[in-house]
Amino acid sequence: MTLHRFKKIALLSALGIAAISMNVQAAERIAFIPKLVGVGFFTSGGNGAQQAGKELGVDVTYDGPTEPSVSGQVQLINNFVNQGYNAIIVSAVSPDGLCPALKRAMQRGVRVLTWDSDTKPECRSYYINQGTPAQLGGMLVDMAARQVNKDKAKVAFFYSSPTVTDQNQWVKEAKAKIAKEHPGWEIVTTQFGYNDATKSLQTAEGILKAYSDLDAIIAPDANALPAAAQAAENLKNDKVAIVGFSTPNVMRPYVERGTVKEFGLWDVVQQGKISVYVADALLKKGSMKTGDKLDIKGVGQVEVSPNSVQGYDYEADGNGIVLLPERVIFNKENIGKYDF
């Protein structure tokens, strides 16, 4: 081999290695963070996110804390930023607790989005939102009203925590709707299970024991709703209406046994998928604005809405909300059609 030919081969090899290195560096990496791992709702959202990653050819990592805490989510956010991830999508346990970490991430060029539970809007670009507070709060009250067929009733609210963004927004709207449309309903208590299955069951049983004449439990939380249903079965209480939000796979046995007549949710698999598609579009296009539309395989078209649909005053370029196309009410007739 001549020296000239050796140098040529060496140069081509070096260029090839450099090209491979550039391709590896250019590959998008998106982190998808739940409030905590080990809950079917969040696992299903993660499955949708990873499905979208395969369709788009991007690397999606699903990981979260084992307990719902600001410190646990902040640690993950910082780790993903330090590892060079291009985008972070997080279901926030607090509206403001994650903001310092998320703002640092944005300063380093990381795209920050929220899903399921929002931060303050200035701490992210877009929120992939299951529904407005008015939509979801109204849905909760309407489900209860279909079963509580009297003017005077006693109602309890039961969900994850007093600080979580999404559920408190829904409950605020639900309580306002009750005051306006069902003034004879008395809200006797509002209690929390803190995303812990054991504590949620204990709390639900405590509510039913303390209020033996309770007419309805409204539980807009993936842990609280099945806990309320199990508590009613444990205490042989078949008079209380139990409604709220959780996944069909978790609630199926309670619906089949008649403990729960109906409950609601949205397709959380689609929510995870939409989240990654929006993040990918941001990474490729650079920005999106209110009114922009995005076609998503297997879902349809979604649109960027202003933050005002969520009741926020904050508006800025490259900032807004993407609403899921629809929400679902599950009952004995249709629950068999869903698997998540």
UniProtKB/Swiss-Prot annotation:
One record GO biological process? transmembrane transport
Cellular compartment(s): Periplasm
User: What range does the record give for the signal peptide?
Assistant: 1-26
- InterPro entries named in the record: Bact_Solute-Bind_Prot2 (IPR050555), LsrB (IPR030159), Peripla_BP_I (IPR028082), SBP_2_dom (IPR025997)
What the entry lists under SUPFAM superfamilies is as follows: Periplasmic binding protein-like I
- CC terms in the record's Gene Ontology section: ATP-binding cassette (ABC) transporter complex, substrate-binding subunit-containing; membrane; periplasmic space
Alphabetical keyword list: Periplasm, Signal
Q: How does it assemble?
A: The complex is composed of two ATP-binding proteins (LsrA), two transmembrane proteins (LsrC and LsrD) and a solute-binding protein (LsrB).
Give the function comment from the record.
Answer: Part of the ABC transporter complex LsrABCD involved in autoinducer 2 (AI-2) import. Binds AI-2 and delivers it to the LsrC and LsrD permeases.
Q: NCBIfam families from the entry?
A: PRK15408.1
Protein name per UniProt? Autoinducer 2-binding protein LsrB
Q: Which organism is it from?
A: Escherichia coli (strain K12)
